[in-house]
């Protein structure tokens, strides 16, 4: 990923650092892979109540249908384009398969236009290839990992994400996920070899508030400047302290270090080591 810095003429460009490779493709667009989506609610539930704060507005988006299942088995595909996707931080690749099928997949790091990929059971351990965990050697870097067999990849799909296969025993494989969590997954589940591209996404700087508004992100207001009815930190005369021993969330729970995972989940016995916060 190449970071582009503007010539300093305004504060917006002086503080901004954008991706010079993020370009949309219009020439080879497949209409059957792109469709509109009605983004209703903007952080509201069915009753219109805010359930996810700081969301709203933003530019209209077209959804790209991504092939997370990689179920074109034993058919070679060629990378035709590498495109920007407004719905995720990672880039996507348009793949032309030998049987005429065309699909989008996540862009593996290092993949270029013209490379070939394949998915199946006995395929080479090569970047971009998809195969079951049971056919991979220990230490393989993987992404787009299935949790349920046949459902498609659900883990390690963000830009720069990579997991590691560290053990195989019985019917399960042990993975170290990008969060640091170590958990068990069925060896029959599939994953893609390599790391997700666009690893330098954290180096980007939007530079101004308007750029964040385009992404559908609204301003974040500190609780200490709110009224007591709106936040536990609110109220007081002038610049007053929060009036508590420890910071709290808008709903009164401890703000620092509180575990937010739901209790008694089915996967508790599959997690060998909890993720590090």
UniProtKB/Swiss-Prot annotation:
Alphabetical GO biological process terms: translation
PROSITE patterns, per the entry: RIBOSOMAL_L2
A GO MF term: rRNA binding
Record keywords: Chloroplast, Plastid, Ribonucleoprotein, Ribosomal protein
Principal place of residence: plastid
Region (Disordered): 1-31, 227-277
Location in or out of the cell: Plastid, Chloroplast
GO cellular component, one term: chloroplast
The UniProt record lists the keyword Chloroplast: yes
Subunit structure: Part of the 50S ribosomal subunit.
NCBIfam families: rplB_bact (TIGR01171)
Family membership noted in the UniProt record: Belongs to the universal ribosomal protein uL2 family.
Stored PANTHER family: LARGE RIBOSOMAL SUBUNIT PROTEIN UL2M (PTHR13691:SF5), RIBOSOMAL PROTEIN L2 (PTHR13691)
Name used for this protein in its record: Large ribosomal subunit protein uL2cz/uL2cy
Organism taxonomic ancestry: Eukaryota, Viridiplantae, Streptophyta, Embryophyta, Tracheophyta
Gene: rpl2-A
């Amino acid at each position: 990923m190449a970071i582009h810095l503007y010539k300093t003429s305004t504060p917006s460009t002086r503080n901004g650092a954008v991706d010079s490779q993020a370009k949309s493709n219009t020439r080879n667009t497949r209409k059957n892979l792109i469709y509109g989506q009605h983004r209703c609610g903007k952080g509201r539930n069915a009753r219109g109540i805010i359930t996810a704060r700081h969301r709203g507005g933003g530019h209209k988006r077209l959804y790209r249908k991504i092939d997370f299942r990689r179920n074109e088995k034993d058919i070679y595909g060629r990378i035709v384009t590498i495109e920007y996707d407004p719905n995720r931080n990672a880039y996507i690749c348009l793949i032309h398969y030998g049987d005429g099928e065309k699909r989008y997949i996540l862009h593996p790091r290092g993949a270029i236009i013209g490379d070939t990929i394949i998915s199946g059971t006995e395929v080479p351990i090569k970047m971009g290839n998809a195969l079951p965990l049971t056919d991979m050697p220990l230490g393989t870097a993987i992404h787009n990992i299935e949790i349920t067999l046949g459902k498609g990849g659900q883990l390690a799909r963000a830009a720069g994400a990579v997991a590691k296969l560290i053990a195989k025993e019985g019917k399960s494989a042990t993975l170290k996920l990008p969060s640091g969590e170590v958990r068990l997954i069925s060896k029959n589940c599939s994953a893609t070899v390599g790391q997700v591209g666009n690893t330098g996404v954290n180096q980007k700087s939007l530079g101004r508030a308007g750029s964040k508004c385009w992404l559908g992100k609204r301003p974040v207001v500190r609780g200490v400047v709110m009224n007591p009815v709106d936040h536990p930190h609110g109220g007081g005369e002038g610049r007053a302290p929060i009036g508590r021993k420890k910071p709290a969330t808008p709903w009164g729970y401890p703000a620092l270090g509180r575990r937010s995972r739901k209790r008694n989940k089915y996967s508790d016995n599959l997690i060998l080591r909890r993720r590090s916060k």
